[in-house]
Amino acid sequence: MSEKIKKQCIVLLSGGLDSATILNIALENYDVTALIFDYGQRHKFEISAAKKIAEIVDIPIKLITIDLGQFGKSALTDNIEVPKNQDIGKEIPITYVPVRNTIFLSYALAYAEVNNIFDIFIGVNALDYSGYPDCRPEFIEAFEKMANEGTKFAQGNEKINIHTPLINLTKAQIILKGTKLNVDYKLTHSCYDPSIDGLSCGECDACILRKDGFATAGIIDPTNYI
């Protein structure tokens, strides 16, 4: 009996905890191509993390280089200090990169249309998130509608699906799910402001959410902190 041919999909792979988890979720049912973005982020260690994660599961990658630092206004792409030990979720933080997920999904959509791929996975999360408006279900629904209205290849019977399997999960639930899927979280990088040798600061929003997630899940955090 021949093996069932899997559909193709695109996974936006940042190298972080969430994207590593959705990669393993997607691999259960799809042949995956990972899109990795070098967008001028200060935490470039996530790029090498993403490449390593993709290498481990032996999937093709497409590295896309864009310079969001040209626009600034974010602590991740501009000469702005990354906030530490602040209350998360009170307001949209300075680590928000303007229109980042719209840009990333647009690149993914272009790659999808050229390669006739109808499924895109992104690891946005609306519960344990830092107040980013482009991580909300409403944003994803709006983008998916736009994608199906504005592309040639979606005018037939098959439609584009933006998959967000983590959107209603807490960080602890994500970690528990990924652990069951054998995600190696030691390979992932979350920190917004790592040391020169890649150690995580332990105090930025991303580090706090990560540490709290592992603690709540009752799983040892494999991250190397300063």
Predicted regions and their residues:
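Immediate flanking context of iron-sulfur cluster ligation sites
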Residues: 181-202
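ATP-dependent adenylation/nucleotidyltransferase module used to activate substrates
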Residues: 2-181
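Iron-sulfur (Fe-S) cluster-binding segments and ferredoxin-like electron-carrier domains
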Residues: 199-200, 206-226
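Residue-level signal for alpha-helical context at structural boundaries
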Residues: 157, 161, 196, 222-225
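Serine/threonine-rich low-complexity intrinsically disordered regions
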Residues: 1-2, 67, 204, 221
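Non-transmembrane, interaction-prone segments in cytosolic or luminal domains
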Residues: 65, 122, 185, 192, ...
